[in-house]
């Protein structure tokens, strides 16, 4: 408790963030608490953030919520759009917590920080803090004080449960890459599903992307201190790898994260992941 209080006071003092706190699930926000935080942001900063909007329902019929932060959040302005997602994997709540903190940082410092003013005034920032609400709620039910290790969604596979949402993206050539970067066994933590976009959660993301014109996207995970960019499914680098490296050098200057492709960072290949699809798996981010 003393460490939590110390963090909160340091955050107020050094980062001017007072809205962020700790949740009831081992310090992490529960799903209900995440939604409450989004509502609270709207009450406190009605001119900078939208009301939460569902982009579709999950396999267990839970809504997947999105909000937008911008200087005119209710208007679609001709500004570059950026997408942030978290909790593809239900056992990575720190990804969501970091996102909520970042959102409060933007909102609470907007009136005093010129850099944040520029960002919010000249970009449209979209946030999906819980891509996998079913899996996350399952962890709360089975481990209410925290520590739940369920990773996948809660698809009933007929004897086992769950599809790894970050192995369920298309296109087929990426999803079915011969690199072995996912499993065909329904009981595996990296089970890819029966086909690309077999799950409502990934379909919801795909459909949402098709309605926007995103110029960049960051998908938050919590495995190690890494900044990972495409490709995961292919052995070659992208045509934009030099640009990715330049961005990555700037983004890791202070945290010293390792950056690169899947093989260059985590040391293994993946297939059907969100980064590859967002990059060139469809026309949405091209």
Per-region residue spans from a language model:
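Extreme N-terminal flexible tails
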Residues: 1-22
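Short helix-loop-beta-strand segments that form the rim/entrance of peptidase-like active sites
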Residues: 95-139
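Metallocarboxypeptidase
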Residues: 145-286
């Amino acid at each position: 408790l003393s460490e939590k209080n110390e963090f909160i006071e340091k955050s107020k003092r050094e980062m001017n963030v007072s809205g962020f706190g700790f949740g009831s699930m081992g310090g992490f926000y529960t799903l209900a608490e995440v939604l409450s935080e989004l509502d609270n942001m709207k009450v406190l900063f009605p001119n900078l953030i939208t009301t939460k909007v569902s982009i579709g329902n999950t396999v267990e019929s839970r809504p997947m919520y999105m909000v937008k932060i911008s200087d005119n959040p209710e208007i679609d302005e001709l500004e570059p759009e950026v997408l942030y997602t978290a909790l593809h994997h239900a056992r990575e709540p720190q990804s969501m917590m970091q996102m909520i903190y970042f959102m409060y940082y933007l909102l609470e410092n907007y009136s005093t920080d010129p850099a944040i003013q520029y960002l919010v005034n000249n970009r449209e920032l979209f946030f999906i803090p819980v891509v996998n609400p079913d899996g996350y709620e399952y962890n709360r039910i089975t481990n209410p004080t925290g520590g739940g290790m369920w990773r996948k969604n809660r698809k009933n596979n007929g004897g086992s449960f769950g599809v790894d949402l970050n192995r369920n993206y298309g296109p087929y050539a990426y999803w079915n890459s011969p690199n072995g970067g996912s499993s065909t066994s329904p009981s595996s933590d990296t089970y890819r599903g029966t086909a690309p976009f077999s799950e409502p959660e990934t379909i919801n993301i795909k459909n949402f992307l098709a309605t926007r014109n995103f110029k960049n996207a960051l998908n938050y995970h919590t495995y190690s201190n890494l900044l990972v960019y495409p490709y995961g499914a292919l052995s070659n680098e992208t045509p934009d790898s030099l640009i990715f490296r330049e961005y990555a050098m700037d983004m890791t200057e202070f945290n010293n994260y390792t950056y690169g492709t899947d093989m260059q960072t985590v040391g293994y290949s993946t297939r059907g992941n969100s980064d590859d699809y967002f990059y060139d798996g469809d026309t949405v981010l091209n």
